[in-house]
Amino acid sequence: NSENLAENLSSDKATNYNGALATLVTVFFFWGFIAAGNGVLIPFCKTYFNLDQFQSQLIDFAFYGAYYMGALMLFVVSSLKKTDIMNKWGFKSGIVKGLILSAVGAGAMIVAVNGADPGDSSAFAFILGALFIVALGFSLQQTAANPFAVALGDIETGSHRLNLAGGINSLGTTVGPLIVGAVLFGTAAKADMAASISNGSITLSSVQYLYVGVGLLFLLSAALFKFSNKLPDAKADANFIGAKKALNTLIAITVLLIVVFFFVFRQYSGLAPGAKLDDKADHLILILSAIGLLAIVGGLLGANKMAKSNPKGWGAMQYPQLVLGMLAIFTYVGVEVSIGS
């Protein structure tokens, strides 16, 4: 784990990790920049592709859904192989793999928006897929970067490095919407967006230029991580303590969510471009969303309750502070993203 890694880094080398930390925090900047930039992309795509509010919010759904699926897949593979995949790779290698995956997503975004016409729903679907790949890479990066930041020096000052990285992440969150908005709209007012799209003065080609730059930065950062002698591999004990009951619970929650959203998306089947759902369909989507929310909260609380009576097979989910922390982060991030978009 990161504590053992930090203890293994000798104190005379700790001062050499300043450059390594500077490289690492650039990754934190990317997360904030892209995630906050989606808040500008949502209303733009809503107008450009003639979407309703739910459809436009699929941008955040695809983006943050990738975080969940990436972490879940890593947990599933580690459980099946009985090996902690990230510790086996090393945090440095994990970040490099994540950056390359995000670069692939940036390339997919360039292809997705190429020649996309207003109202082209198939192009919007490809944009969602590209964002999913970008965020899937972020999922790998975040899994590795946080413990890596702690490992880059004295364990007692690990929280200081995390605070610094978090501050840089917030900087990306601050400037992301400004830069993305300037790239997309220039000086055009929001009220003129529909007219500007109709007369062709605002197109998706600007998104191409943005993601060309972002993709190149991903690759540059990956190269810096890969070939930097100042960055340790940061590998740790790859032994994996199985948590079969926790795994089954998370898979069950995921399957239920897939079923819920299958019926949500089914409401849009056969709907003409630009057409709106009727009140009955809107009401059903609201009910299904509530069921999905209950599945997450109820599943986690139920798992913790069962783990109290028999902790075997539950792993870290036997501890209430973990489950309650998961729910707190779920609530906080949900509110933060909803307000921002």
Language model: regions and residue ranges:
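Conserved MFS/SLC helix-loop-helix module at the cytosolic interface between two early adjacent transmembrane helices
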Residues: 71-125
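Extracytoplasmic
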Residues: 19-51, 74, 176, 336-341
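Hydrophobic core of transmembrane alpha-helices in multi-pass small-molecule transporters
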Residues: 29, 118-141, 330-331
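Glycine-rich segments within core transmembrane alpha-helices of 12-TM secondary carriers
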Residues: 157-189, 218
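Central cavity-lining transmembrane alpha-helices of secondary-active solute carriers
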Residues: 57-84, 171
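Extracytoplasmic gate region of multi-pass secondary transporters
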Residues: 38-42, 177-185, 252-288, 315-341
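C-terminal membrane-cytosol helix-exit motif in multi-pass small-molecule transporters
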Residues: 180-189, 212-239, 250-271, 287-308
